[in-house]
Amino acid sequence: MSKRKSKDLCLPVGECISKVHGILRQRLFQHHGKPFGVDSQHKHLVELLKRTVIHGESNSALIIGPRGSGKSMLLKGALEDIFGMKQMKETALQVNLNGLLQTTDKIALKEITRQLHLENVVGDRVFGSFAENLSFLLEALKTGDRKSSCPVLFVLDEFDLFAHHKNQTLLYNLFDIAQSAQTPVAVIGLTCRLDVMELLEKRVKSRFSHRQIHLLNSFSFSQYLQIFQEKLSLPASFPDSQFAEKWNESIKSLVESKLVEDVLQKQYNASKDVRSLHMLMLLAVCRVNVSHPHITAADFLEVFRLRNQDSKANILHGVSVLELCLIIAMKHLQDIYDGEPFNFQMVHNEFQKFIQRKAHSVYNFEKAVVIKAFEHLHQLELIKPMEGLSVRTQKEYRLMKLLLDNTQIVEALQKYPNCPTDVKQWAMSSLS
């Protein structure tokens, strides 16, 4: 009887929503396992690390792929698999270096010493060279022969930045140790540069194993939809099975929706980075509440629109009517003179023509006020001065360029609160 009750457990909607938020947020924020569609790369990396950690062989490899392709996630998943193996007699030491933080070999060596907890061993000892210092550190970890020595994994994030260090001393010595029969060492570099091998000096390149693991986000759109569905579906272990069933059905219908498919297609075309998809899903999940218990196609459309807003068009919604008039005048000038730069005096003259045509003084501002408005548009970076021109030129005659196009101005006019009709008509006449 108790089993039947637990099976048919029906929780309040609020509690179900709270659990949905907890499960999906954890799933979208915390990346576990390995990235989608990289089974062969994962297997290759596990075998490589296994030979170092378990069999005492030294190795080196590069993981290459664009940002967001899952390089760090792949390495993390492989290390979790390695450290979970029964053959692991002792924990291997891991040293993490980042090219953005360790900007010189000296800083990198200090960081290696710190992470290996060998500050006391080094003490005030003076070394003749970088190689001698690094060899001493690794010698201090030895407990006997090669197989009984503690293996060390060096992870070099932003690997290409280490190639810019003077003489590439760190890379040379790490690869040299990995090639020799000293302490078992694995050197794994992570980089987004496909031409990274061209950055290495000949002596460094000769000591590198030339093992390269490529991650290129090569999954198809149908696989992209599969990732979307898997990430948003609730597990079978969800306490309220009826709610979970309805939720998963709604997610399935979302994937089949033409509207959602179009949104995801645009996202896929813009970037195959799974993290950007996660952010899109997360914003949609945040809209779920007691009164709105399921994600809808409209939610995704709105979230996509918010994430892809035009920042410059948004700035236009907050400018004054005078500043908006000046932008329309600039656009009119660019249309007349085929995109040639303009100066304040030209814009002011065009604005005066508009005032004279309307035969009223609602927009008849003093020139000093108009100059201030023009300067404010420059501060907002909606216009910029032309490069290579003398700064001694009077500001009224300094050539400028408009950083907006027709579509951005039209969109701003449509959304501008209480935009005067005559200003709209003037804008449309110049934009038509």
Swiss-Prot record:
GO biological process terms, semicolon-separated: DNA replication initiation
Gene Ontology cellular component list: nuclear origin of replication recognition complex
Gene3D superfamilies according to UniProt: P-loop containing nucleotide triphosphate hydrolases (3.40.50.300)
Ligand binding (ATP): G65, P66, R67, G68, S69, G70, K71, S72
SUPFAM superfamilies in the cross-refs: P-loop containing nucleoside triphosphate hydrolases
Source organism superkingdom: Eukaryota
First-listed, main subcellular location of the protein, grouped into a coarse class: nucleus
Keywords: ATP-binding, DNA replication, DNA-binding, Nucleotide-binding, Nucleus
InterPro entries given in the database record: AAA_16 (IPR041664), ORC4 (IPR016527), ORC4_C (IPR032705), P-loop_NTPase (IPR027417)
Location in or out of the cell: Nucleus
Pfam families: AAA_16, ORC4_C
GO terms of molecular function: ATP binding; DNA replication origin binding
Protein function: Component of the origin recognition complex (ORC) that binds origins of replication. DNA-binding is ATP-dependent, however specific DNA sequences that define origins of replication have not been identified so far. ORC is required to assemble the pre-replication complex necessary to initiate DNA replication.
Family classification: Belongs to the ORC4 family.
Subunit structure: ORC is composed of six subunits.
Annotated protein name in UniProt: Origin recognition complex subunit 4
Source organism of the structure: Xenopus laevis
